[in-house]
Regions:
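Bacterial N-terminal signal peptides that target proteins for export
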Residues: 1-7
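Bacterial N-terminal signal peptides
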Residues: 8-17
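Bacterial Sec-dependent N-terminal signal peptides
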Residues: 16-45
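Acidic/polar, compositionally biased interaction segments
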Residues: 43-304
């Protein structure tokens, strides 16, 4: 059911520039999705769009610098909310299917919102935070749909990569490495919960030509703390995909939220020592629906 709704929402175009795949294979450490043979985008041929500063937000939610690192890199996102009179949804699909699109554009360099006390809402590039039609600043009961294309850079080794999410509240990562218009729930971390890690049960076979369009749907329930992080690790051939952190949940397990900003706990640092990392900003290419990043300094596409 999720796959059918996802296809209906996105249509054909999201994956038209996706990678081609050869097969699905299984190793002792879990299944591996082969994704070699992907196509490259011609960034210079993609048309520019002028964005309104009042309706655009750059790296909100305490996710780092407000500037993009490159005109064609980043993650485009849309913001959904539950208007007065509608339920306070506790799952991702309800926000995407039944929530209201606020009509704003959000850009992230990467998915790296560590556990954060979120009370100021989403600041626009013009300064004031976004408001719903009734004048409310969104601090709770909202959903975010991230879209981008995942790739390796020249600094990354080809191989099998396992993905994971850390989120508070729920999130679902969808992707279609086969290029067959069949996106799947690749990492399911849905539901109302404190910061929780969910891990993919299969790996992605990636090389320099691989480009994988993806969508990450996330929702925030009751105020104030939230988390939204996308991680990966390179897995040696035949290695197990099990990790002690997969499925672990806790308010202060991964980060100490009594500090501002939150401080990594030894449990999170041990996760990094096992090869996990937040996917770097250089690995995200903007989708064709938002080909240029208005948060890039000097890009000339962020209006007033």
């Amino acid at each position: 059911m999720r796959n059918q709704k996802w296809i209906a929402l996105l249509g054909i175009n999201l994956f038209s520039a996706g990678c081609n795949s050869t097969d699905l294979s299984t190793s002792s450490g879990g299944s591996t999705v082969a994704t070699s043979g992907g196509t490259s985008s011609s960034f210079s041929a993609r048309p520019a769009r002028i964005y309104s500063a009042a309706l655009t937000s750059c790296n909100p939610m305490g996710s780092g610098s407000t500037s993009a690192i490159d005109l064609n890199l980043g993650i485009a996102a849309r913001l959904y909310y539950s208007p007065a009179g509608q339920p306070e949804y506790t799952d991702v699909e309800s926000y995407m299917n039944d929530g209201t699109d606020l009509g704003v554009d959000i850009f992230f360099n990467q998915v790296n919102v560590i556990p954060t006390y979120f009370s100021a809402g989403f600041p626009s590039a013009a300064g004031p935070p976004f408001e719903t039609p009734d004048g409310s600043v969104l601090m709770e009961w909202f959903g975010i749909r991230y879209k981008s294309t995942l790739r390796l850079t020249a600094n990354d080794q080809p191989g099998n990569y396992q993905l994971a999410t850390l989120s508070d509240d729920g999130s679902i990562l969808y992707l279609d490495p086969t290029g067959g218009q069949n996106p799947v729930d690749f990492v399911d971390n849905d539901g109302s919960h404190a910061t929780q890690m969910a891990c993919a049960k299969s790996t992605l076979a990636m090389d320099a030509s691989t480009q994988i369009p993806f969508q990450l749907d996330y929702f925030q329930g009751p105020r104030y703390h939230l988390t939204s992080m996308l991680l990966w690790r390179r897995v040696p051939d035949g290695a197990s995909l099990s990790d002690p952190a997969c499925g672990v949940v806790g308010i202060n397990t991964f980060f100490d939220t009594t500090h501002t900003p939150s401080v990594p706990q030894p449990y999170y640092e041990s996760l990094l020592s096992r090869g996990w990392e937040v996917i770097p900003a250089e690995n995200f290419v903007l989708p064709d629906t938002n080909p240029e990043n208005p948060c890039f300094p000097g890009g000339g596409i962020l209006g007033i």
